[in-house]
Amino acid sequence: MSRYRGPRLKIIRRLGELPGLTRKTPKLKPDYINKSTPNKKVSQYCIRLEEKQKLRFHHGLAEQQLLKYVRIARRAKGSTGQVLLQLLEMRLDNIIFRLGMAPTIPGARQLVNHKHILVNNRAINVPSYRCKPKDIITTRDRPESRARITKNYEFSQTYKIPNHLTLHSLQSVGLVNKIVDRESIDLNINELLVVEYYSRKA
């Protein structure tokens, strides 16, 4: 299954707020609200599927990409669910998003693909690059790169930077302080249900 490129608000209506996908809030029409069936029993499979979809769409991953991360998390020490979230949160595209250098993760991925971003003074054009503590994220020293990042800062200046990151916006410099912990991940998701969904596949 490829990465989703369709209407983002359609996904938000179905799954709820996903800041990595879009910052827009859909207006629910009365007829859409009336379609809900609160008395209908939802299967455990559907509940697990929905949590998996939240994680996939928030990070903008294809199904096989997410499955790959689940398999890596299973081989690591510690809680599989928390390791999975850490792997995704430490991706370069997500770090750029969390620093406010891009309004969404797809926007951050575009910055990386077009080589607007440096990691430790090296141009990195791989969105899945795994950031490490003490990594320094900067904007490439060219007018187009600086203009795009500055515009994004203005858009996202009200967003709170998580404590595993530090941002010096005037210099367009971000610092990775440590591996992210669960409390710093601003995403309403039950990662254990995601792991359970993949229990027979990973």
Swiss-Prot record:
One of its GO terms (cellular component) is chloroplast. Residues 90-159 form the S4 RNA-binding domain. Belongs to the universal ribosomal protein uS4 family. It comes from the Eukaryota. GO terms for molecular function: rRNA binding; structural constituent of ribosome. It is found in: Plastid, Chloroplast. This is Small ribosomal subunit protein uS4c. Pfam families: Ribosomal_S4, S4. Keywords: Chloroplast, Plastid, Ribonucleoprotein, Ribosomal protein, RNA-binding, rRNA-binding. It comes from Huperzia lucidula. One of the primary rRNA binding proteins, it binds directly to 16S rRNA where it nucleates assembly of the body of the 30S subunit. SMART domains: Ribosomal_S4, S4. Part of the 30S ribosomal subunit. Contacts protein S5. The interaction surface between S4 and S5 is involved in control of translational fidelity. InterPro entries: Ribosomal_uS4, Ribosomal_uS4_bac-type, Ribosomal_uS4_CS, Ribosomal_uS4_N, S4_RNA-bd, S4_RNA-bd_sf. One of its GO terms (biological process) is ribosomal small subunit biogenesis.
